[in-house]
C-alpha cells in the first residue's frame, strides 16, 4: 500500500511540474481570456487587478495602446 501511495504522489508531482501556466498569449480575444479567468480563477491574467483579464487583447479596454506593444 505504501508503495502505491508513493508512486501516486510522484506521478502527481511530475504532472504538475510540467503543467504550463496559461498566459494572455493563449487567447485570441479579451473575452476568451475573461471567461477563462472567471471560470478557473486564473487571476494572474489580470496584471493590474482591475477585474479585466488581458486588456491588451482584441476587445479589451487597452487594445491598440502603445503600452500594449
From Swiss-Prot:
Residues 1-19 form the signal peptide. The keyword Signal applies. Keywords: Signal. This is Uncharacterized protein PM0157. It comes from Pasteurella multocida (strain Pm70).
Amino acid at each position: 500500500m505504501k508503495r502505491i501511495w508513493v508512486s501516486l504522489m510522484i506521478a502527481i508531482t511530475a504532472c504538475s511540474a510540467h503543467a504550463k501556466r496559461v498566459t494572455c498569449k493563449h487567447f485570441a480575444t479579451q473575452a476568451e481570456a475573461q471567461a477563462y479567468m472567471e471560470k478557473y480563477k486564473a487571476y494572474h491574467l489580470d496584471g493590474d487587478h482591475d477585474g479585466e483579464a488581458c486588456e491588451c487583447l482584441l476587445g479589451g479596454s487597452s487594445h491598440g495602446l502603445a503600452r500594449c506593444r
